[in-house]
Amino acid sequence: MGIVLARIDNRLLHGIVATQWAGRSGAQRIMIIDDTVANNELTKASMKLARPTGMAISIITEETALNNFKAGKYNDHTVFVLVKKPETLVKLTEIGVKVPELVVEIGRAHV
């Protein structure tokens, strides 16, 4: 199945995302794609604490995400992707990954 929902949000995983969007997505896994977060153990640990109970979480670099999606690693998963930059999603779509629904966080407004 792959990605069921993607969200661009500079805060990535926080209360509203964990309590509202994650459940709404129907995903089995939250995937945070961000080089800075993936390489910072303290930030990764705090993101893992924020994940909803019962959902798997992956916090990976952009390169790892691209390689894993190319290899079909998530074909049998439902994934809710969180990114800070739209360019990350553009790169995923350029390799053929489908993003059926996108939420863009702009300040406190949702687009």
Predicted feature residues:
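Ordered, amphipathic secondary-structure segments that act as subunit-interaction surfaces
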Residues: 60-105
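Long, hydrophobic N-terminal alpha-helical segment
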Residues: 2-51, 56
